[in-house]
Each structure stands twice: as C-alpha cells, then as structure tokens.
C-alpha cells in the first residue's frame, strides 16, 4: 500500500478501533443520546467504549484528551455467552450442538448471523410448516445471497407484524441490551458508551424504551 499509493507512512488498525478516532469530529446531528450523558460540555474528553452488532459483534475502547487519542482495541465480542433466562440457556445448548462447538460466544447470538441462529433454533423446536420464513431458510441452504439476508428478512417480517419474527427479534434484542449494560459496568466509560453497527438505527426505538 505504501509503495502503490506513494504514501510516506501506512498504519493498519482494527476496523472497529478506528471509530474511536472519529468521536471528536461528530456533529450534534450525527448521533442521538439515549440517556442523559455525563459529558455536559460535549467536548468528548474521557474514557469511551463503542459496541456494535452487524456482521459480527465489535467492541473498542479509547481515551480522548485535549491533545491525543489513545485507542484500546478489543475482541470482547468473543466473550462467552452467559444466558440469563431458561430460554437463552436452551438456545446456548442448541448452538453448541448445531455449530459443533464447546464454547458459544456473544457474537454467535448478537450479530446478523446470531439473529438467524435464533430463528433456526425456534424453527427446530416448533412444528411450523407453513410459515413463509421456513421456506426462506430452505432456500438459504442453496443460496449465499439469501443466507446473508436472513437477518434482514426477520426484521422485515417483524416490522410487518409477524408475531413469531417479533418474538425472535425480541430475544435477540434482550441479549444485546443485557450485553451493553454489562459492558457499561465493566468499562466504566464515563466519557460515553456508543452503540454503533448496522443494527443500531433499526432498533433505536427499542433502545430508548423502558
């Protein structure tokens, strides 16, 4: 890259860690506040954490001062999934068998693929023959394009009022919001806890609900 573009210096960094560098440059219309922030002056100084579910589950931390930004990359999305309900425990056991793994990370549940996994689990335990999504699951076995769009289809059907898809989406969101709460306690990020990723705008109303 350095030679091809004739740059003086090239530095490669984690794709999620780079988001920390962008925080000080955000304008007020580029983010929404979910809870009253501790940064009353909007100077963005302090310790920050970013979490985002999308293709995977990304996490990054950083310290922003008046003169410098220190970025602390993380692979926290690979922390082991800790079920908080019987339903989540059953999901975890199913994922172990379905994926043939001993350890289930949060990313297996809280991501686009994770949402699809929850749907597959639901359909494996319930006799639902005529639901349109079941046919979509079958088609996904033969098409990577359809497979990649499973999460989007779930959200679409849930938005259209499908009760089963809404239930699946709610289980996913409950796991995600619980993880975010744990992250806030773990990191004590008084500068700000930021929710990023492709799923954040789609679930904004859920994030601000009681």
Model regions: which residues?
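Phosphate-binding/catalytic loop of phosphoryl-transfer enzymes
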Residues: 2-112, 116-117
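ATP-binding/phosphotransfer module of carbohydrate and carboxylate kinases, centering on a glycine-rich
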Residues: 90-210
């Amino acid at each position: 890259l350095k030679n091809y573009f004739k740059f003086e210096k090239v530095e490669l960094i984690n794709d999620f860690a780079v988001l920390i560098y962008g925080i000080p440059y955000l304008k007020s219309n580029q983010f929404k506040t979910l809870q009253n922030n501790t940064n009353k002056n909007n100077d963005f100084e302090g310790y920050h954490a970013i979490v985002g579910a999308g293709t995977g589950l990304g996490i990054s931390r950083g310290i922003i001062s008046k003169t410098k930004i220190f970025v602390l990359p993380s692979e926290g999305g690979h922390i082991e999934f800790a079920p908080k309900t019987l339903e989540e425990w059953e999901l975890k056991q199913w994922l172990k068998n379905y994926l043939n793994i001993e350890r289930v990370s949060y990313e297996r549940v809280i991501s686009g693929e994770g949402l699809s996994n929850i749907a597959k689990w639901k359909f494996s335990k319930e006799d639902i023959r005529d639901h349109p999504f079941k046919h979509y699951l079958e088609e996904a076995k033969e098409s990577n394009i359809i497979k990649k769009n499973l999460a989007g289809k779930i959200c679409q059907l849930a938005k259209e009022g499908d009760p089963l898809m809404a239930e699946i989406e709610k289980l996913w969101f409950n796991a995600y919001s619980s993880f975010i709460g744990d992250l806030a306690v773990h990191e004590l990020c008084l500068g700000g806890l930021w929710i990023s990723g492709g799923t954040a705008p789609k679930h904004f109303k859920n994030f601000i609900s009681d």
